[in-house]
């Protein structure tokens, strides 16, 4: 064994020991992590060491601070503070049962066995007896099941069906865009989920998807702390959207902003790419003596001097006040998007729609980054290991915050910067 590798092995072991002594139950978590590390094979030690050294950079918390660092006394939190008028909301098909149970088992073990918030399950067709029994057996909390009517789920009846079908068929090469059901789902989450009668009874909601994993204990009530700190919207991952899915969404958004005379919020710059304007300014300075400019074509999503950087809050996890979605301002915005037809002529996702609405209507102090939570969906995860409680994140998947497609730099910028700069 090379001395270089030996030193890195011992450094990793010491790092793991220190980390889990500080933040975790030593006996269980350290053993589990070392077993996972050994299974990777020795040739991956250096990569694994790098992943563990990749610290999350501290962010200015003037406008948004973690609700907890480490573990709170969950028994005290659950017994002393009132429950909010809140629910989990799950959109699922009967065929999603296994994935739903996996997500429920995770959130129940990490959080809801202590706080017992109810669930609302929605489907575009009736749930089977098997589905209902299985999810009821997975929790002690109350559950309600709802079916979506045509108005909430299907495309508008006054829009030509052949035109919709042709538009969707033409979106070849755009991820999920050839599936009408995917367009319907994105439209439903963008403008209709909060209108269902079962959702109208609640003030807060927490979206729960099938096949997600919560990898840290949540030892406090996010709903209570959101309310206490005057937060309206909470997220756990901020990521770049695929440009082909939203070629004109930003244009329609800025147009609506101007038509409606909406003031620019202090969060709006989170969504703006300033590199093009900086480049143009530099090129003009370099070419000022030649009498003319040779400039690149502006991006397609540029409007009124603004360019969308494709950042959005990943809405498969979000905690939000429902009066935000029920507000006149939000519904005027999504009505404008509906009239533009982008839910079928393009593949607008609900995540960028929600996010741009948040940027239009909320200030930065009203949005919370759940940096202490651990959350994984598919191969993308955020691990709250340095802030969270009893985290057990997949050992070989880097925190998305440390990857190129993350929007952490944009978030830090709008929040006042990284503290280590």
UniProtKB/Swiss-Prot annotation:
Report if keyword Transferase is assigned: yes
Q: Name one Pfam family in it.
A: Glyco_transf_15
List the GO cellular component terms. cytosol; Golgi apparatus; Golgi membrane
PANTHER family xrefs: ALPHA-1,2 MANNOSYLTRANSFERASE KTR1 (PTHR31121), MANNOSYLTRANSFERASE KTR5-RELATED (PTHR31121:SF2)
User: Single GO molecular-function term?
Assistant: alpha-1,2-mannosyltransferase activity
Q: Which residues form the active site?
A: 318 (nucleophile)
Q: Where in the cell is it found?
A: Cytoplasm
Q: Name one GO biological process term.
A: protein N-linked glycosylation
Report the EC code(s) recorded for this entry. Answer: 2.4.1.-
Lineage start: Eukaryota, Fungi, Dikarya, Ascomycota, Taphrinomycotina
**Keyword list, A-Z:** Cytoplasm, Glycosyltransferase, Transferase
Which SUPFAM superfamilies does this UniProt record tie to the protein?
Answer: Nucleotide-diphospho-sugar transferases
Can you tell me where the transmembrane regions are? Answer: none
Q: What class of enzyme is it?
A: transferase
Q: Which family does it belong to?
A: Belongs to the glycosyltransferase 15 family.
Q: Which gene encodes it?
A: omh5
State the function annotated in the UniProt record. Probable mannosyltransferase involved in O-glycosylation of cell wall and secreted proteins.
What is the protein's given name?
O-glycoside alpha-1,2-mannosyltransferase homolog 5
Q: Does the keyword Transferase apply?
A: yes
InterPro entries from the UniProt entry: Glyco_trans_15, Nucleotide-diphossugar_trans
**Principal place of residence:** cytoplasm
């Amino acid at each position: 064994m090379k001395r270089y590798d030996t030193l890195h092995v011992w450094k990793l072991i010491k790092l793991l020991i220190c980390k889990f002594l500080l933040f975790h139950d030593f006996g269980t978590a350290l053993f589990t992590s070392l077993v996972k590390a050994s299974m990777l094979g020795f040739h991956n030690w250096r990569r694994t060491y790098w992943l563990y050294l990749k610290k999350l950079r501290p962010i200015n918390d003037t406008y948004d601070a973690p609700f907890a660092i480490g573990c709170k006394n969950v028994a005290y939190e659950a017994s002393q503070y009132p429950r909010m008028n809140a629910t989990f909301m799950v959109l699922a098909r009967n065929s999603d049962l296994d994935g739903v149970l996996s997500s429920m088992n995770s959130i129940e073990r990490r959080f809801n066995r202590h706080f017992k918030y109810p669930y609302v399950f929605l489907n575009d067709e009736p749930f089977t007896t098997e589905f209902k029994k299985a999810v009821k057996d997975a929790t002690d909390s109350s559950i309600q099941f709802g079916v979506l009517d045509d108005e909430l789920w299907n495309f508008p009846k006054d829009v030509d069906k052949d035109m919709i079908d042709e538009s969707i068929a033409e979106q070849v090469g755009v991820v999920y865009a050839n599936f009408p059901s995917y367009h319907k789902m994105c439209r439903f989450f963008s403008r209709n989920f909060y209108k269902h009668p079962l959702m109208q009874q609640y003030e807060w909601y927490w979206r729960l998807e099938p096949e997600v994993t919560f990898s840290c204990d949540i030892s406090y009530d996010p709903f209570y702390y959101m309310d206490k700190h005057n937060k309206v919207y909470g997220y756990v991952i901020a990521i770049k959207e695929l440009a082909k899915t939203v070629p004109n969404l930003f244009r329609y958004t800025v147009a609506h902003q101007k038509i409606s005379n909406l003031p620019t919020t202090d969060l709006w710059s989170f969504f703006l790419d300033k590199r093009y304007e900086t480049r143009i300014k530099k090129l003009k300075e370099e070419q000022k003596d030649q009498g003319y400019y040779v400039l690149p074509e502006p991006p397609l999503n540029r409007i009124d001097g603004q360019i969308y950087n494709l950042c959005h809050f990943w809405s498969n996890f979000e905690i939000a006040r429902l009066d935000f979605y029920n507000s006149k301002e939000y519904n005027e915005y999504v009505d404008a998007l509906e009239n533009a037809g982008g839910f079928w002529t393009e593949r607008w996702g609900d995540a960028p729609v929600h996010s741009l609405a948040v940027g239009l209507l909320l200030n930065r102090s009203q949005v919370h980054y759940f940096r202490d939570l651990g959350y994984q969906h598919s191969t993308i995860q955020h691990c709250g290991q340095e802030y969270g409680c009893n985290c057990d994140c997949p050992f070989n998947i880097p925190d998305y915050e440390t990857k190129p497609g993350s929007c952490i730099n944009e978030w830090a910028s709008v929040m006042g910067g990284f503290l280590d700069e």
